């Protein structure tokens, strides 16, 4: 889920200190916007976006993103999505009733950049946050990205030592 690091000269006290930092790892990817759910505060604001990606020429449901947009952005998104309204979901497989509840479906023409923590076993985004629209990418080119192959580990930059001996002198 992330990394915990400490300042090099930081102590090891019990409890939390500023010398220790927790950093969460996340992915970032573009998704096609297939619909939206109006905000519970105002129907003129987006509450969440319904996302998908192309696979084998078909649009696949990837989940929703309901955080990361300001009130202004949420209002602007409704203005951009309203002209694209359609009656049916654009996905190859019909979403479940729960996934489709309250959704205003749109033509899959806009692309959102989304930051997220992981994919579930069912292929749904976890802990997604909207980061903006991508005007430079056509929706038809958006597919699920595969992680790059892991690089070979670098040689350690820090020598591990003990006051009385050196560990792994060849490293």
Spell out what each predicted region is:
Residues 1-171:
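Catalytic cores of nucleic-acid ligases and guanylyltransferases
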